[in-house]
Amino acid sequence: VTVDCSGYPKPDCTLESFPLCGSDNQTYSNKCAFCNAAVERNVTLRHLGEC
């Protein structure tokens, strides 16, 4: 599973809840929060859902 993070980082994310687990073992609340971290800190997707 991959997530398209083109167009990120974004200054504001919605409060939409769609958890994603990052390679840093942190649960991100949604795609926007995950993609901001992916772009800024080179985090990759571990799996969909909470870590």
Curated annotation (Swiss-Prot):
Please state where this protein is localized.
Secreted
Q: Specify the glycosylation sites in chain numbering.
A: 42
Per the record, where is site Reactive bond 3?
15-16
One term under GO cellular component? extracellular region
Main localization, broad class? secreted
Q: Name the domain of life.
A: Eukaryota
Task: Cite the entry's keywords alphabetically.
Answer: Disulfide bond, Glycoprotein, Protease inhibitor, Repeat, Secreted, Serine protease inhibitor
Kindly list the cysteine pairs connected by disulfide bridges.
Answer: 5-35, 13-32, 21-51
- PROSITE patterns assigned: KAZAL_1, KAZAL_2
SMART domains membership: KAZAL
Could you give the domain comment from the record?
Answer: Avian ovomucoid consists of three homologous, tandem Kazal family inhibitory domains.
Q: Which PANTHER family match?
A: SERINE PROTEASE INHIBITOR KAZAL-TYPE 7, SERINE PROTEASE INHIBITOR KAZAL-TYPE 7 SPINK7
Spell out the protein name for this chain: Ovomucoid
Per the UniProt record, the lineage of the source organism begins with:
Eukaryota, Metazoa, Chordata, Craniata, Vertebrata
